[in-house]
Amino acid sequence: MADDIDIEAMLEAPYKKDENKLSSANGHEERSKKRKKSKSRSRSHERKRSKSKERKRSRDRERKKSKSRERKRSRSKERRRSRSRSRDRRFRGRYRSPYSGPKFNSAIRGKIGLPHSIKLSRRRSRSKSPFRKDKSPVREPIDNLTPEERDARTVFCMQLAARIRPRDLEEFFSTVGKVRDVRMISDRNSRRSKGIAYVEFVDVSSVPLAIGLTGQRVLGVPIIVQASQAEKNRAAAMANNLQKGSAGPMRLYVGSLHFNITEDMLRGIFEPFGRIESIQLMMDSETGRSKGYGFITFSDSECAKKALEQLNGFELAGRPMKVGHVTERTDASSASSFLDSDELERTGIDLGTTGRLQLMARLAEGTGLQIPPAAQQALQMSGSLAFGAVAEFSFVIDLQTRLSQQTEASALAAAASVQPLATQCFQLSNMFNPQTEEEVGWDTEIKDDVIEECNKHGGVIHIYVDKNSAQGNVYVKCPSIAAAIAAVNALHGRWFAGKMITAAYVPLPTYHNLFPDSMTATQLLVPSRR
């Protein structure tokens, strides 16, 4: 058995060697394969590792970029927030609400970290003092003067320059006393000065000194100063208010109308002043034409007064219209008197004794004139006019004579209230224009013209032509006040060289200050061209 085994082993030995070689070769191959596999694995691992590293790096980069972006965003947000906060602070600083005091903003201030001193200052500035709530007492005037006392301290100024201001008047009159108030009178429509003003002084003693400044130049124009006539104006206003009576309907007389004027035409003229209750135009029963007069009744007396002021003398169809008051008698009847006739107003009528008495009574109404007791008794005894058949008329008409008398009286009163005190000296304005005068000796010609004119009223003892004055002023001194008054009345308002002459009195001391040589002048002057 052993031999068999050996023989078999011997027979199988070469095959085993080949198998061993093959196995060794296979082992080497396997090892090499394993090595190759391991190498490839290591390389793949390395590749994988490198790729993972690169991925990690890219991720890190992306993370860093995102973080930087987030940081930038956060920074920009913070900047925006800081800007908005600064804007809020500015807004709060400019416009402080009543709820922005220390009680409401203490937490915010704590975060901002303002100093304690600033907080206190803001608190003090924002907190309202309890003493400021009380209003300051109204200042009372230093001296409570009555209107009459204030009028005694006031002067009236005329012939003022167009560009003058209250400050200029105050500086001008401060040389004679302390000025309390200056009131310039201006036109209510154009707001331009009318050339007049009232100046009130603190002391009464300053008034005569201010009047002595008449003739002094203020802004190149000689001023006229006189005492205020406010007390007379106040008395006239009170009397006018008493005559006005209570409000209510008022009837007006309208006369001197053209015969073709109709009631509709009168309504169109008078209705803009107020509501009209009735219009009665007197017609001639024979001819059917208007008699030239009528009556208009207004619902409101104020409207009637406005119409009376504006339309009296208004030219209608080439004739000045006459408008007057109508007062009713207690025993009035509907019939109108013959005195209502406009034709009778122009031609007049021969009345008897009773008629003259009644006409006197009617003309005396509203004027304050007293009728003698005997005339009043005669009027009470007679019940009608001398014509007998004519019934007692119901309306009293303001006749043209009465209207003219009242107009003249008011004009004289106004002139008396405005006209300054007359003296021997006066000033003539608008006598020449220095810019247009080119002839040699033109001032001598003007002087001779004035002397010739004044010699008709008493003469001249001194005259001066101010060749440099833009107003064309000529100063004249007469031997007496009567001569000066006559010359002023003759020259004032006259036209000379295309301009209207203005004459104004100059106080004697002022004239002597301007022309010292006139103090000793006594000889009457004659024209040099004689």
Swiss-Prot record:
**PTM field:** Aryl sulfonamide anticancer drugs, such as indisulam (E7070) or E7820, promote ubiquitination and subsequent degradation by the DCX(DCAF15) complex. RBM39 degradation results in splicing defects and death in cancer cell lines. Aryl sulfonamide anticancer drugs change the substrate specificity of DCAF15 by acting as a molecular glue that promotes binding between DCAF15 and weak affinity interactor RBM39.
What molecular functions are annotated in GO for this chain? RNA binding; RS domain binding; U1 snRNP binding
Task: List residues, modification Phosphotyrosine.
Answer: 95
Its biological purpose = RNA-binding protein that acts as a pre-mRNA splicing factor. Acts by promoting exon inclusion via regulation of exon cassette splicing. Also acts as a transcriptional coactivator for steroid nuclear receptors ESR1/ER-alpha and ESR2/ER-beta, and JUN/AP-1, independently of the pre-mRNA splicing factor activity.
Q: Which NCBIfam families has this protein been placed in? A: SF-CC1
Q: How does it assemble?
A: Interacts with NCOA6 and JUN. Interacts with ESR1 and ESR2, in the presence of estradiol (E2). Interacts with RSRC1 (via Arg/Ser-rich domain). Interacts with SF3B1. Interacts with ZNF106 (via N-terminus).
From the Swiss-Prot or TrEMBL record, give the protein name. RNA-binding protein 39
| Gene encoding the protein | RBM39
